[in-house]
């Protein structure tokens, strides 16, 4: 596996795929392939329509760039023949454009979130950028006529790879990608009795729903 990025860097088959917009850290995407928040959110002043438009534009650029990658592949690959293995090949290729320092286990700064001095450790694509990228490409594949069951971006091998990258970078950089659970405030004594009565009168609702929410079956 370690030989693949080196082989691809020196191969003319991939020389044309250098569109760095595909992994922009300023993307508006908030949901990645693993369902986590993979990129920085937009400011609160941004409207939902602007957020959606920015996400759609980024997704379109990602899709076009991946199509270029397939055309530059030797031999050229059609989308119908693209598999999870080709997606992994693509992700490893992108590492040469990374800007995130990932310390090796022999580095003195391994596990240090704020190293006090530079080191020769390699630059890689951040897990959050890769996760968001796969999330966008997975959606674009199905929007362009692909079937969910044949979606190479949702392959088990891709999910496992992203998980390995997340765990490895978390340890190497000394950062945590786990979501912090919000502590719910304890109910006061005046409201505890009324909430107890209400719980017998209606079913427990999911957070963010109301009593008027209707169930919908997904086709």
UniProtKB/Swiss-Prot annotation:
| Assigned keywords, A-Z | Developmental protein, DNA-binding, Nucleus, Transcription, Transcription regulation
Write out the GO MF terms.
Answer: DNA binding
Q: Where are the transmembrane segments?
A: none
Ranges of biased composition (kind: Polar residues): 200-219
Q: Where is this region: Disordered?
A: 31-58, 172-219
Protein name per the record: Protein LIGHT-DEPENDENT SHORT HYPOCOTYLS 3
Per the Swiss-Prot or TrEMBL annotation, the motif Nuclear localization signal is positioned at 179-183
Any GO CC annotation of this UniProt entry: nucleus
Kindly list the places in or outside the cell where this protein is found, as annotated in its UniProt entry.
Nucleus
Record-annotated ALOG domain positions: 54-181
Q: In which tissues is it expressed?
A: Expressed around apical meristems, at the boundaries of vegetative and reproductive organs. Induced by NAC054/CUC1 and NAC098/CUC2 in shoot organ boundary cells.
The protein's superkingdom reads Eukaryota
Skewed-composition ranges (Low complexity): 43-53, 188-199
According to its UniProt record, which protein family does this protein belong to?
A: Belongs to the plant homeotic and developmental regulators ALOG protein family.
Which Pfam families did the record assign? ALOG_dom
* Consequences of knocking out this gene: No phenotype, probably due to redundant function of paralogs.
| Protein role | Probable transcription regulator that acts as a developmental regulator by promoting cell growth in response to light. Required for the maintenance of the shoot apical meristem and for the formation of lateral organs. Promotes petal formation and growth, but may suppress organ differentiation in the boundary region.
A single GO BP: petal development
InterPro entries linked: ALOG (IPR040222), ALOG_dom (IPR006936)
């Amino acid at each position: 596996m370690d030989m693949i990025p080196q082989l691809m860097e020196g191969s003319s088959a991939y020389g044309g795929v250098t569109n760095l917009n595909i992994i922009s850290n300023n993307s508006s995407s908030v949901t990645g392939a693993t369902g986590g928040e993979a990129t920085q959110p937009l400011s609160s002043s941004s409207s939902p329509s602007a957020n959606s438009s920015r996400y759609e534009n980024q997704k379109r650029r990602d899709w076009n760039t991946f199509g270029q990658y397939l055309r530059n592949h030797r031999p050229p690959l059609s989308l119908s023949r693209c598999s999870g293995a080709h997606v992994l090949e693509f992700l490893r290729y992108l590492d040469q454009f990374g800007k995130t320092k990932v310390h090796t286990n022999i580095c003195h700064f391994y596990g240090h979130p704020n190293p006090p001095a530079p080191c020769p450790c390699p630059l890689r694509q951040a897990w959050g950028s890769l996760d968001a990228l796969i999330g966008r490409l997975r959606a674009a594949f199905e929007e362009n006529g692909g079937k969910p069951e044949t979606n190479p971006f949702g392959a088990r091998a891709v999910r496992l790879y992203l998980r390995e990258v997340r765990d490895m970078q978390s340890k190497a950089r000394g950062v945590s990608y786990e979501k912090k659970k919000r502590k719910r405030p304890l109910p006061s004594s005046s409201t505890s009795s009324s909430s107890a009565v209400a719980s017998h009168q209606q079913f427990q609702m999911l957070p963010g729903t109301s009593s008027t929410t209707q169930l919908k079956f997904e086709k």
